[in-house]
């Protein structure tokens, strides 16, 4: 009877409770931190784009310049097989095949060709301007051509150039000049012809020992043709050597030659600058649009990093070599074990989160005579959400000094420089990747610590309100020493709990509970004595009964001596 009394007594003593906890869900998202790997979190954001669409697209609505089977040189010089490129609109980038078929139809070389290609990475449109019309060279023949550049079975030549040869038996000094009044810089290309032998030199130019000089305010170049036998290319042993310069606004370029000059008929006014580039690709333009293009395909993403290809054009994420960059945005995901109950050993923020709280990251669970329920703490959740929302922007801001990997090209004579450049770019990308990965690890560590701190702050905020009107249960929960209805619970949650209002009731109940504990110890002692005495009496009675039975049937003889 006493045991039943005690059970009822302790059941009656248990009071209303409120617990501080955090959100949990069924997420399997994992992140890495400085100290841990594969930490399961409630929410995470992958910030590394790994995919592309495999297509070459318009960039911001502007199509690329698709060279097809022509090279950059073939386009600018005017290879007859590239006539469709004689007039081109604005481009977003340039598509060039790895080994284009039509380049220099007349065999030769293009000085500083790689630098010219690099120049094109900042140009989005050339306006072709006639600078030295063909009919101005009245003392020279301007119809020179070659079977190497044949079109429709007839000899031809580069469309944008004029090959000056002798007229009759004379080749007077050829002079020409152009003053750049276009308002923009102008690309100007010229050439020098190198014959196969002296007989060819005289047949074309009459003169031997000729020169070609080109001069601007910043350039003076004098070339002497090199007469020599060479292996045949495209059926020719002779060569043409092309050079280029940028003519500044209001500057003048002067040409003078006693023979072997390939003069420009057209120059290229740089009418629009901007971020461009040359995509080495065998693909063709497709009906699609993008804001970021790589040689492998377009990237359409809002993520801050990608690992598709180091060469990009447009509004692109930062390139890194990483395989994984995931930012934690939520909390450690440690769902409570439902079978053990809310107020069991796993309750609160110490041992598990609440899947039942879905409208916030941190909050409360209360239990009283009116029932129980979850409620998120909107203020702390909103502050945390605002901080996490800015995290990706913070990462981007910290990494805003992106190293731009430019696809530079080098001639065969500069392979050592090319190898050195590649090693430098690889080194930069390695460092850049390491910085990005380290930043993500550090941010993840800070995020998880930030959430832990927010839960602790919420717990401390409640504890400071309730003070000694409650008992801390040690698992994130408080047990009230007074009755706390739903209105009382709401006041705790919104920070308006009236401590003095419940102080006396809590004090009385706190003392009563202490008295119950003391009296319960006395009851336990009485029960122990009672059990001992009762057990001894029962044993004595049982022994006496057995002895009496044995004496009555002769199994035991009893002698009484006086």
Swiss-Prot record:
It is found in: Virion membrane; Host apical cell membrane. The keyword Cell cycle does not apply. One of its GO terms (biological process) is virion attachment to host cell. A lipid is attached at residues 551, 558, 561 (S-palmitoyl cysteine). The record marks 340-341 as: Cleavage. Residues 1-15 form the signal peptide. Palmitoylated. In natural infection, inactive HA is matured into HA1 and HA2 outside the cell by one or more trypsin-like, arginine-specific endoprotease secreted by the bronchial epithelial cells. One identified protease that may be involved in this process is secreted in lungs by club cells. Disulfide bonds join 19-477, 57-288, 70-82, 105-149, 292-316, 484-488. Residues 547-562 are cytoplasmic. GO terms for molecular function: host cell surface receptor binding. It comes from the Viruses. Belongs to the influenza viruses hemagglutinin family. Binds to sialic acid-containing receptors on the cell surface, bringing about the attachment of the virus particle to the cell. This attachment induces virion internalization either through clathrin-dependent endocytosis or through clathrin- and caveolin-independent pathway. Plays a major role in the determination of host range restriction and virulence. Class I viral fusion protein. Responsible for penetration of the virus into the cell cytoplasm by mediating the fusion of the membrane of the endocytosed virus particle with the endosomal membrane. Homotrimer of disulfide-linked HA1-HA2. Major glycoprotein, comprises over 80% of the envelope proteins present in virus particle. The extent of infection into host organism is determined by HA. Influenza viruses bud from the apical surface of polarized epithelial cells (e.g. bronchial epithelial cells) into lumen of lungs and are therefore usually pneumotropic. The reason is that HA is cleaved by tryptase clara which is restricted to lungs. However, HAs of H5 and H7 pantropic avian viruses subtypes can be cleaved by furin and subtilisin-type enzymes, allowing the virus to grow in other organs than lungs. This is Hemagglutinin. The lineage of its organism: Viruses, Riboviria, Orthornavirae, Negarnaviricota, Polyploviricotina.
